[in-house]
Amino acid sequence: MSQQLSREEQERKYPEYTWDLTTIFKDDEAFEAAFKEVENELGKEEQFKGHIGDSAETLYNALELEDTLGTKLEKVYVYAHLKQDQDTTNDKYTGMESRAHQLIIKFSSAWSFLVPEILQIDEDKIQSFVNSYDKLQKFAFDLKLINEKRPHILDAETEKLLTEAQDALSTPSNVYGMFSNADLVFEDAIDKDGNAHPLTQGTFIKYLESDDRKLRESAFRNVYKAYGAHNNTLGATLAGEVKKNVFNARTHNYKTAREKALSNNHIPENVYDNLVKTVHKYLPLLHRYTELRKELLGLDDLKMYDLYTPLIKDIKFEMPYEEAKEWMLKALEPMGEEYLNVVKEGLNNRWVDVYENKGKRSGGYSSGAHLTNPFILLNWSNTISDLYTLVHEFGHSAHSYFSRKFQPSNSSDYTIFVAEVASTCNEALLSDYMDKHLDDEKRLLLLNQELERFRATLFRQTMFAEFEHKIHAIEESGEPLTPTRMNEEYAKLNKLYFGDSVETDEDINKEWSRIPHFYMNYYVYQYATGYSAAQSLSHQILTEGKPAVDRYINEFLKKGSSNYPIEILKNAGVDMTTPEPIEQACEVFEQKLNAFEKLMKA
């Protein structure tokens, strides 16, 4: 498949490998009509201002109108953003996406009175409304979530002031983004033959994966030389972000920034502590893996820039798309007929946009809305990684399909805390199937990639989570949060996580300054918890069979956001308030490490 086709050529020559957006709107004219319809309905909310608490029926009508309009708007936006992503050079669709985005902002602004007005109603009165008016049952859980925020909502004038201040408070994050992505320039990386290679944020990891150790070291040194030259500035920027989080938490009557951040998804704080504590217990496994890496690379000293280069090289593993579909369907057979039928529907009904074309957005994702099919964007290049992306994105898409089919629109979106569970569970099922059906040479390649996935997701993201909590705790204790202190704390964590087999130095102590996740307010821990939950659920599916599959589909995939995410996972068979899922994930890592060592010595 040519990667140089224009979008029009791609759709004309290979329509079966493009997504079918006519299932959303027949054509652009239908999109414009739907856009106009939503636009014209803005203003209807005025009838409810000052009257939300008048009666149960009024409350229901307001919630229903907001939900209905929001759902229509979501459909409009999804069409525009998918059209833009299939060809980012097309000004027409860039304009459509921009207009749809602006309409979302207008909609949000128009309805911003709703939650504050609900909070002006006495909690008992809301409960009596729900009990006496059956239609309100649809929104009972939403109202419960709003009620739980009461101790943390201030008077309307103060909330308005704080909302207006958020733009200014976002300055640290905005400054970091512009500095890191736009202003920062790296010296070229030099390879063993003295050739210069342009070094950017995009090429950095590629060079760290190189066989050429001189190129790896040069890339590593030059990146941290650039960040290190601005250590004081970046320290002040991150400290500003931490101060913002602490300020927002304290002004809303939370004890800590973490308590506020986790309360958004009703996650108990012990889930966070439990993750860190349990991963600490299994760090000797990570040390064993890094020691093995040192041995297999034949190095006297393993440096941080040696951690990314593959241990298994020169094994070709081509994966054409048609073959990948077969691998996926076989790997997902343990999920049963109901699940497989959804995947087959997606493959047969053009949910997937497979190949690259001129102007197409890079990467891969799953998108969609309550009133549309799920849609998957890929840029297929016949690699094993592409197969994993396909399986991963179908995990998201099947989750979305079941949630939207079995939940009303107001509870069909699942939370960030569980978002990566379904996708990563599919990856684990694929790994299990491939491990049983590949020859030893390709198994080695696969195991190497899986061990790296564990290192990068479970261990590394937990280390990030530990650092993030540490710097917030320093600020909350009243101690000065300086760049020097950040370097020291990060150095301690690198030593703890990587042990004696990896030599750390001053450069890696500044790695915190290039990690954008530290500007995402207690987001990063969810990569590790989601990964652990997925490993646990896939283990149950493979060992228990149908009972585990039924729990997974009925109690997790079909539940959307109809309950707290912790409870949804618990009902599916994973209790993230206990160490068990993290322990199971670490034990899977150990099994894969054992298998890898055994094959290497065979």
Where are these regions (language model features)?
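A well-structured
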Residues: 1-314, 325, 598-602
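Post-HEXXH active-site segment of zinc metalloproteases
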Residues: 388, 400-424
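Short pre-active-site segment immediately N-terminal to the catalytic Zn-binding motif
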Residues: 317-319, 369-391
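Short beta-alpha connecting loops at secondary-structure transitions
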Residues: 375-379, 406-416, 446-453, 472-474, ...
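Long, K/E/R/D-enriched contiguous segments that form extended
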Residues: 296-334, 340-341, 348-351, 399, ...
